[in-house]
């Protein structure tokens, strides 16, 4: 796979510390051929890493990979302002805006361009088709137009502009200077600088950047799609102008690995178009790969001109890797045992809270299926997360978590694991890892059974959304608080999980709250719960 098409994109999310996105090769496949087009060599119009380094084989077109410099102070007519220096510049740059779009080709007076010694290009700029050319940039000082000098690379790009590879300056204060543009030129009529694939045109008396009509390219590697790995969807963005150059016109059809997941490309800013894929294991035939640290979603975006494929198909393979946490692990599970609750907070919108059962202390491996079957010594991990809403302001608090022998959350037989936001201190197997500190809460408990021939255990948690700006969210627990009266529970804010049964027991015979005639004969060693004990805590 040519490294030219590799691109890493970071996406800062409230609920993820890091999102790693990898865009694989975009390949055009002609009818009857399944092999992607490979780049066998790189010409003079591509910039590659230094020979002998790991980046030696990484090449790209600087006309499509540069930093915009919209800095009016670089104008050769500017004789005011503080004295700046470009010593720390490194990479490919394009000058835009009122200050000018090209470096000066003649010696510039000292103390112009907001610097002491202005730098100018000694020679003429290359023409389109010349590729990347080597030039000398000179700095005017002490009566010498080339008192300091350094090498720069320049390339002429489609669209009538140049890009420059600048690696600092020989001294300070030196700065690269540009010739201000003529305000009457067409380029100045567009508020934003047009990209190489665009031209500045007037449509209905309004100037803007539109796709060039003369684009005709067979180089699929110039497409360079962009990838945005979001919390709920993956977005692939493609340059609309370059699609047109590859023969894919306005009515292009897009579909993922599941042909039923098809749609017309959505229009983005600056002549880009996009298609989204949900971050779900079973959606649109996503391929889900999972290791110890990440869940990786893969799919392929196919672009064609018609449902009847006669010409070119453009396939874009993409993947997003998400660090595993509670939320990502639930998305990656096909059938997690999970409970959801919509909660409205006056003046702050609607929130979604989810609670699930996990198999380990990392809370990244949820139980799946219809029920959980555990051995005697098993520890059950319970995690809850505030998924939707203002998680920067509201913290999730588990006020009361309790077990019942039936699925009825109002069952009189209750064993409290958490009461009044504090853990049951009489049960040494209960560990509350987090409660009220963030948008997540989690606790663990060794499993048990109820006396009285009940086969099943159900878990229930009453939640509270705590406004961290106006409330003390983290519980302050003491033994006197733990022994307080039985709390009043708001059943409208209770999440339910279960049933849970002991491994080796008969199939659950109770789903409606009626005890099975074939109940457990021996209580699990953790605790033997009776109706009386349920109310003692």
Curated annotation (Swiss-Prot):
Signal peptide: 1-28
Region entry ZP-N, spans: 228-321
Residue span of region D10C: 61-81
Region annotation (Beta hairpin) ranges: 41-60
Tissue: Expressed in pancreas (at protein level). Specifically expressed by M (microfold) cells which are atypical epithelial cells of the intestine (at protein level).
Ranges for region Flexible ZP-N/ZP-C linker: 322-345
UniProt-annotated stretches for the region ZP-C: 346-484
Domain annotation ZP: ranges: 228-484
Function: Functions as an intestinal M-cell transcytotic receptor specific for type-I-piliated bacteria that participates in the mucosal immune response toward these bacteria. At the apical membrane of M-cells it binds fimH, a protein of the bacteria type I pilus tip. Internalizes bound bacteria, like E.coli and S.typhimurium, from the lumen of the intestine and delivers them, through M-cells, to the underlying organized lymphoid follicles where they are captured by antigen-presenting dendritic cells to elicit a mucosal immune response.
Complex and partners: Interacts with SYCN. Interacts with bacterial adhesin fimH.
Name used for this protein in its record: Pancreatic secretory granule membrane major glycoprotein GP2
Source species: Homo sapiens (Human)
């Amino acid at each position: 796979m040519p490294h030219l098409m590799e691109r890493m994109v970071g996406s800062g999310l409230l609920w993820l510390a890091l999102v790693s996105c990898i865009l694989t090769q975009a390949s055009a496949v002609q009818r009857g051929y399944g092999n992607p087009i490979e780049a066998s060599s790189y010409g003079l119009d591509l910039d590659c890493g230094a020979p002998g380094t790991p980046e030696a084989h990484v090449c790209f077109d600087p006309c499509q990979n540069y930093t915009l410099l919209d800095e009016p102070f670089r104008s050769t007519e500017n004789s005011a302002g503080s004295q700046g220096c470009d010593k720390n510049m490194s990479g490919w740059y394009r000058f835009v805006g009122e200050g000018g779009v090209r470096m000066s080709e003649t010696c510039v007076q000292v103390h112009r361009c907001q610097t002491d010694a202005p730098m100018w290009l000694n020679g003429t700029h290359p023409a389109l088709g010349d590729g990347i050319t080597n030039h000398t940039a000179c700095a005017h000082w002490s009566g010498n137009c080339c008192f300091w000098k350094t090498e720069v690379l320049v390339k002429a790009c489609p669209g009538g502009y140049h890009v420059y590879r600048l690696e600092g300056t020989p001294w300070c204060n030196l700065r690269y200077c540009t010739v201000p543009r003529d305000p009457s030129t067409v380029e100045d009529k567009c508020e934003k600088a047009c990209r190489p694939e665009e031209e500045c045109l007037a449509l209905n008396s309004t100037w803007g950047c539109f796709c060039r009509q003369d684009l005709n390219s067979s180089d699929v590697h110039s497409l360079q799609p962009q990838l945005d790995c979001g919390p709920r969807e993956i977005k692939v963005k493609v340059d609309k102008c370059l699609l047109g150059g590859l023969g894919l016109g306005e009515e292009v059809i897009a579909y993922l690995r599941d042909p039923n997941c098809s749609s017309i490309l959505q229009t983005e800013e600056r002549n880009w178009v996009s298609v989204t894929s949900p971050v779900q294991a079973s959606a649109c035939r996503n391929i889900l790969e999972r290791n110890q640290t990440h869940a990786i979603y893969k799919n392929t975006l196919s672009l064609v001109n018609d449902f009847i494929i006669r010409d070119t198909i453009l396939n874009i393979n993409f993947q997003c890797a998400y660090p595993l946490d509670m939320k990502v692990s639930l998305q990656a599970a096909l059938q997690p045992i999970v409970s959801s609750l919509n909660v409205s907070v006056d003046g702050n919108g609607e929130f979604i809270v989810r609670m699930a059962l996990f198999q380990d202390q990392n809370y990244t491996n949820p139980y799946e299926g219809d029920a959980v079957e555990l051995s005697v010594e098993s520890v059950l991990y319970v995690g809850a997360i505030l998924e939707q809403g203002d998680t920067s302001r509201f913290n999730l608090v588990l006020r009361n978590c309790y077990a019942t022998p039936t699925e009825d959350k109002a069952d009189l037989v209750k064993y409290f694991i958490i009461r009044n936001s504090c853990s049951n201190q009489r049960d040494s197997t209960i560990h509350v890892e987090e409660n009220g500190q963030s948008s997540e809460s989690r606790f663990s408990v060794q499993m048990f059974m109820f006396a009285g021939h009940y086969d099943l255990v159900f878990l229930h948690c009453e939640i509270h959304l705590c406004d961290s700006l106006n409330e003390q969210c983290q519980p302050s627990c003491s033994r006197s608080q733990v022994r307080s009266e039985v709390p009043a529970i708001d059943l409208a804010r209770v999440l339910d999980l279960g049933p849970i049964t002991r491994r080796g027991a008969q199939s659950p015979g109770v789903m409606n709250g009626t005890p099975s005639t074939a109940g457990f004969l021996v209580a699990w060693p953790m605790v033997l719960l009776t109706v009386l004990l349920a109310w003692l805590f």
